[in-house]
């Protein structure tokens, strides 16, 4: 089987070379002007099946998401430089992605973490995965590094990242997330740290960062996971010093906290001064970690749990950010993360993965609507991707049928899913892009994975790039 896949890969390479313009790629010697407005959407930890299960639940079919109509569709590999958790002092890559091994359907005995391998490809995909810090660093800086690094390379040097480059170009900047803003992915767009776990120091760095005009996310020290006031502060994600600095007239940022204020921002009814921190009144996730015993039931939602009433949606936050950044004369760069998709994928919680992915999809729709209303695709770029897979969700028979897709049970019904892992996976992920500069991603896609076509139906030629390639297109150096 591996030999057949390698033969198919060779054929696909010839096909891709012949059809270099299959997705409308511009000639390599025609540099595109950078987009005025750049929006990067990251559904953290979204394996192929994650995108599909949310579409099946919400729409009963694939093809109805805002990014499904985008002009550029690519694969994106996510492996780190190495799997060390500390810098090893060199630039040698020790891990890679091999399509032939990733899609190998040879039956395989054995197990990892109590889960059977089933097939050689599954076993391969469970190994050598990136963490969110290294993945986000590659997306933000263009440099592969060790797991755990926030804009630090494997030699221990601090790296320039996307919001710094955007600010140097005169653009406004924003970072939004459904998890604490000091967590790995948002941190990589506003901080530099040898370790992702230094949440308090990262929060202080981000809040004082002149390259960040707007920050929105969770991590509120005074509220718990269900949005209830705490008896004493929890400063895990926002340090006591950072929180103290936000109080009073000398605060480094305008502070927005209530759902009502986030909704007023989204409607343009509130115009606070930048820089701004939108700190949602919840501790770790917007909604993903809520307890049904506290919030009550809502059978109309996938999980059956009502939502926390005082918490805005990621889509509302996105609209609010666009109200504040969208009128800046030189444009803006904005990163929006559906971070809790990853948290729920670690738990293999199908219903809550779907809820989080749906909220993420609605945030993308808000940005597309903004482009149609306030801008145009000749000056705006939207990229939708994940930083890595997580959980390897496939169809219910995928223990017998290799790579069986998620099974559609119709709109409003949980799809058929079998999870094969409880952590990150080394898979070729899915990317969509549209607007000014999207064609440059095609030019950066120098490898081919035939299964993007044959198994996933994602694009027409299997073209694939790396996460570091995306960074080089995202915000060019001024």
Predicted regions and their residues:
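Glycine-rich phosphate/pyrophosphate-binding loops
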Residues: 162-164, 168-187
